[in-house]
Amino acid sequence: MRLSRRRFIQRSSAVAAASVLPIGCSSRSDQSPLDNDRAIIIGSGFAGSVAALRLAEAGIRSLVLERGRKWTVEGTDTFPTTAALDRRASWTIPPAGSQSEGMAYAGLLETISGPNVSAVCGACVGGGSLVYGGVLIQPPKDAFESVFPYLSYDSMNNVYFPRVLAQIGASPIPDDILASSNYSAQRTFMRDVEAAGYTALKPAASFDWDIIRREIAGEIPAAASIGEYPFGCNSDAKQSTDKNYLRLAVASGLAEVRSLTEVEMITER
């Protein structure tokens, strides 16, 4: 039976992952992931992290299934850099039984190729929040309503957008950081924008500015302040959702994250 997205969400408490196999581990065929959990969340990125926390706040126990690994910053070389990419950047999980099966590695990004374009997506606890630029731009009302005419932009503007920024800890770049030598290119860009007759804005960004200040002061090795954050941030300055939404959900005792676990099928009970 094929479920629509809406019907799937409505029946989420009755959905089981029929074949949930931790990578490199065996699974118990006599136990469904829903035996002890009322809801299953597939993926731990932005949407999955928010769902886990909101369910926990409602008193609903959930299990978050994530195919990728948990990345914890330890030292200054947890993540690959744009200057020195290595296998940590790539999700490389060959089909079972293939000749390259032994080369499997749960890296940060999976490349999905189509006939005309290839796309990359996060494959880790925290999902895309670890591997995006950290900029949180609020769409203008006309653009938002052209895509979501059935949603209230005023509610999003007054309640939900501010709530997200507060939860993540996102804010525009502070003036003292923008004035530093590390951000001379940004200042040049803003001057060029103004010279062209446009208005340069400073959108909210999901970084811990105090950590970036330490980078600029030379107290810790530079990472975010030199643009090294697309593949994770080795100074831990990026406020990814595993450090806020998902952390709070797990701390409530009502959410469990099961990493290195891939969902292969969804069936209706």
Label every PLM stretch briefly.
Residues M1-R7:
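N-terminal secretory signal peptides
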Residues R2, S49, V117, R187, ...:
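Residue-level marker for well-ordered alpha-helical positions
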Residues R6, R54-L55, V120-A123, M190-V193, ...:
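A general structural signal for short secondary-structure junctions and capping/turn motifs
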Residues R7-S27:
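N-terminal export signals
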Residues D30-V147, L151-Y153:
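N-terminal glycine-rich phosphate/pyrophosphate-binding loop and immediately adjacent elements
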Residues R69, F79, F207, V263-E264:
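Conserved beta-strand edge residues that scaffold enzyme active sites
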Residues Y150-E262:
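Conserved redox-cofactor binding core of oxidoreductases
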Residues M265-R269:
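Conserved beta-strand-loop-beta-strand element in the redox core of flavoprotein oxidoreductases
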